């Protein structure tokens, strides 16, 4: 007798039961065991490595920016935006570092991805990298919570598989950072080999590191990676690719969202009171069936018994 064809969905019934239990546990901010994280990352890799560099997303969708390990504020985001999978979510990267709950935050988002893969899109941010996480907190948090670096390794290996960008209904282009002088078209992005550590330079690096700027043309980025790009660049890119908007994250904005380049670009930031001290609001963008947008702003969740903030790491863009 011929063997049954492999299921298109890598989740079997037993794993669905496990993942549902993990999600329930993580909603209580209780980390998974090291072995559970290993299984989680193996299953997520099967899904994420098949996704293209420009992931097609249908509206309605709610688009979110950086969350940076601020787990209780992610709960606030879900309270405002709706629970998964009722709401279709697109996150534009930077799940880890800076906040105190990177492990729980990224574990939950990856669980939701494998459980509801067509209702959750996870893009790669510049912090989804081995080098950056060793400086800004995720590596140290993994050592503290697990006693070794295995969980950090499982996740940073998985980060190599995250798609770089998304395209909502062919019109709204979503990514973490910004544009690149090496990239004129979405087809250029589709042709990149993304399954690797974030390079120090080049088009993949630029997509995760660049920022819009008031000055025209391309400029040297003060971050030491990526570029700054002016309104002329955004307008040309949008026109050439039939886009109405570039939605990106990567920069703290005090209202949670900020228009630039004559509404060719919007920045969305979803970590309120960033680093537990910046005093900013957070936001997400709801795109309805007709791609009409509304911004949902939210404040930080009440904090109970969180560790005292110490400033140990350099602030490369505060």
UniProtKB/Swiss-Prot annotation:
SMART domains: PP2Ac
Catalysed reactions, semicolon-separated: O-phospho-L-seryl-[protein] + H2O = L-seryl-[protein] + phosphate; O-phospho-L-threonyl-[protein] + H2O = L-threonyl-[protein] + phosphate
Observed phenotype of the null mutant: RNAi-mediated knockdown causes severe embryonic lethality. Causes a failure to duplicate centrioles resulting in the formation of monopolar spindles at the 2-cell embryonic stage, a failure to align chromosomes at the metaphase plate, delayed cell cycle progression and defects in mitotic exit including failure to reform nuclei and decondense chromatin. Also causes a reduction in centrosomal microtubules. In addition, recruitment of sas-6 to centriole is impaired and sas-5 and zyg-1 protein levels are reduced. Few of the surviving animals show occasional defects in vulva induction.
Cofactor, how bound (note): Binds 2 manganese ions per subunit.
InterPro entries, per database record: Calcineurin-like_PHP_ApaH, Metallo-depent_PP-like, PPA2-like, Ser/Thr-sp_prot-phosphatase
Alphabetical list of Gene3D superfamilies matching this protein: 3.60.21.10
Pfam families per record: Metallophos
Family (UniProt): Belongs to the PPP phosphatase family. PP-1 subfamily.
Function (record text): Protein phosphatase which plays an essential role in early embryonic cell division. Probably together with constant regulatory subunit paa-1 and regulatory subunit sur-6, positively regulates centriole duplication by preventing the degradation of sas-5 and kinase zyg-1. In addition, plays a role in the recruitment of sas-6 and maybe sas-5 to centrioles and may dephosphorylate sas-5 and zyg-1 negative regulator szy-20.
Subunit-structure text: Part of a complex consisting of a common heterodimeric core enzyme, composed of catalytic subunit let-92 and constant regulatory subunit paa-1, that associates with a variety of regulatory subunits which confer distinct properties to the holoenzyme. Interacts with szy-20 and regulatory subunit sur-6. Interacts with regulatory subunit rsa-1. May interact with sas-5. Interacts with unc-51 and unc-14.
Protein's name according to its UniProt entry: Serine/threonine-protein phosphatase 2A catalytic subunit
Gene that produces this protein: let-92
